[in-house]
Amino acid sequence: MSLDKTQIISQILNHSPSHIIIGYSGGVDSSVLLDITKDLDIPTIAIYINHNIHPDALKWQLHCQTICNNANIDFIAHSLDQAPKGESFEAWASKQRMDFFIEIMSQYSSPILLLGHHLDDQAETFLIQAIRGSGLAGLASMPYYKQLNHGAVLRPLLDYTKKDIQDYASQNKINHIYDDSNENIKYRRNLIRNQIMPILEQINPNISRTLSRSAKICAESSNILQKLLNEKLQKISQNNSLIISELLSLDKDIQKSLIHHWFKETTNQSLKNKQTEEIHKALNNDIHTGWQFDINQQFQISVEYNQLIIKNNNQVDLILDNKDIIEWLKERFNKDFDTRELIVRQRQASDKCRYQGRDKANKLKVLFQELKIPTSERSKAKVILLNDKIIAVYPFFICD
């Protein structure tokens, strides 16, 4: 179908963004997005991520900068380092890109990030997740719209095919670059795009739309499941721990889903299926206090009486030896406290704090973004607790 510029603009404006951020590679997809939004009366920032892999990467960066200068669009270029040894470059680079986008978004009141993923990308993502053996959440692939702690992500081209986008670019004489590394089948997505999808199209000429529809069904089912699990989790959890007797009173499949969901909600990390199975099996074998299971270098799950608890291996128990932290706290905290009762630890994904002068608590990640604390500085944060309540986040702020 033909790309509907008016409809896409309407979908963007429905979210009333203060600023538009575009992930701009110079390729046809993001170039079409830039063309569609360039005349909107909304401040727009195009971000080019230089992966430092292709020999033409700097030339593409200059191309993007020239296009933006000519259209009076703000332009930011960000360069990535090499991926850590042993890590998948695709996964690492994807996280690095999103982290940088979020850092820029945190500077504005209600920004929206536009990404140029299209229907064929969605079909490829579905296959990648299926090959990995992903569950519903993974098979849901890429969401059309996602609310972030600060701003939102929108993929306005997700219902359009690559051909629809190329036709629009041709009709509107849009200048864009072509990345020949997209032909390199050493990358899984390129292998699927260039070799597997053509074979599947022989079976079903509309395979991209079919797989994209399957991803949408999985997304809807996953959303329903998450809501049901959240409701159940509230009933069988206490202070981020699971009440074992309550958990074991449920259907076994629900038990496993809740263990996986509880860990993800608490740590912002996912258990592997094998880990979930092992924890579930141990719980049903009448384990007792003292049982421990290492998830990774950071987290450990243990049993204490009737509770399943997540321990952070990076956690520091006592604050007594942290003189700098004590002095910092004494200067800012307006209540008396016994240093022997204080605990300092690394922050966790579920941590919340009621910032001074506010009526309700927010997740620390939200506060970091609102206070414009750079991503590079957030790793320094230490959570200070008194009587199991967060009273401060060193060296940034005090909580009410």
Curated annotation (Swiss-Prot):
Organism, scientific name: Francisella philomiragia subsp. philomiragia (strain ATCC 25017 / CCUG 19701 / FSC 153 / O#319-036)
The reaction(s) this protein catalyses: cytidine(34) in tRNA(Ile2) + L-lysine + ATP = lysidine(34) in tRNA(Ile2) + AMP + diphosphate + H(+)
NCBIfam families per UniProt: lysidine_TilS_C, lysidine_TilS_N
Molecular function GO terms recorded: ATP binding; tRNA(Ile)-lysidine synthase activity
Superkingdom, taxonomy of origin: Bacteria
GO cellular component, one term: cytoplasm
Main subcellular location of this protein, as a coarse class: cytoplasm
Family the entry assigns: Belongs to the tRNA(Ile)-lysidine synthase family.
Keywords for this protein: ATP-binding, Cytoplasm, Ligase, Nucleotide-binding, tRNA processing
Major enzyme class: ligase
SUPFAM superfamilies in alphabetical order: Adenine nucleotide alpha hydrolases-like (SSF52402), PheT/TilS domain (SSF56037)
Biological-process GO terms, alphabetical: tRNA modification
Protein name stated in the entry: tRNA(Ile)-lysidine synthase
Family annotation (InterPro entries): Lysidine-tRNA-synth_C, Rossmann-like_a/b/a_fold, TilS/TtcA_N, tRNA_Ile_lys_synt, tRNA_Ile_lys_synt_N, tRNA_Ile_lys_synt_subst-bd
HAMAP family from the UniProt entry: tRNA_Ile_lys_synt
Pfam hit, one: TilS
Role of this protein: Ligates lysine onto the cytidine present at position 34 of the AUA codon-specific tRNA(Ile) that contains the anticodon CAU, in an ATP-dependent manner. Cytidine is converted to lysidine, thus changing the amino acid specificity of the tRNA from methionine to isoleucine.
EC number from the UniProt entry: 6.3.4.19
Residues annotated for ATP binding in this entry: 25-30
